[in-house]
Amino acid sequence: MKKIITLLIIATLISCETNVVKVPVKAGEIALGPNTGSKFYLTSDDNVDIVKKLLESWNNMDPAGMFEVLEDTITWYVASEKKPIVADKNFIVEYMSAYDSISQVVQGYIPHQYEGQTSNVVSVASRETKFKKDGTVEDDRLFERFFIRNGKIFRVMAWSAVWNTN
């Protein structure tokens, strides 16, 4: 009888199904603006892949590759400018024509959203070195946010940090 009860218990345990419910972990807080108090949560790495494709094309100075993951026109907040630039493919081609090469080395990617947001954001910290055709070199430490909707980047916001000389 003990064997039958033991077998029934084992069979019951084996037949149990564990349901894993994935709940987004919310953390942090928006401190300013209309979404003050909203929490952040992580999103899919598919968004990271979109940004990686963009930056690979950026490093290769390949506008056609860039526009595989960019909308036809994007809003680009360049770190050195006070106002955003509305950039299309022709603008990017013209912009890149001043450079011999570009090297952007990324330190990390964080895909996220805040509560109620419909687009996804990938935050990126990187070092970017651009070599101009006139021989000058632009060297920046960047923090950027890439805004994605329907699998395409529609806005890029960039901030630059001063190099520590200590």
Give the location of each predicted region.
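Positively charged n-region of N-terminal signal peptides that target proteins for export
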Residues: 1-4, 17
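Sec-dependent N-terminal signal peptides
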Residues: 4-13
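Short, low-complexity N-terminal intrinsically disordered segments enriched in polar/charged residues
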Residues: 16-60, 68
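Short beta-strand edge/turn micro-motifs at domain boundaries
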Residues: 19-22, 139-166
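Hydrophobic pocket/interface hotspot
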Residues: 51-54, 65-67, 74, 88-92, ...
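A solvent-exposed, acidic/Ser-Thr-rich amphipathic alpha-helical stretch
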Residues: 67-113
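Short, cysteine-centered beta-strand-loop-beta hairpins and adjacent loop/turn segments enriched
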Residues: 101, 129-139
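A short hydrophobic beta-strand element
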Residues: 118-128
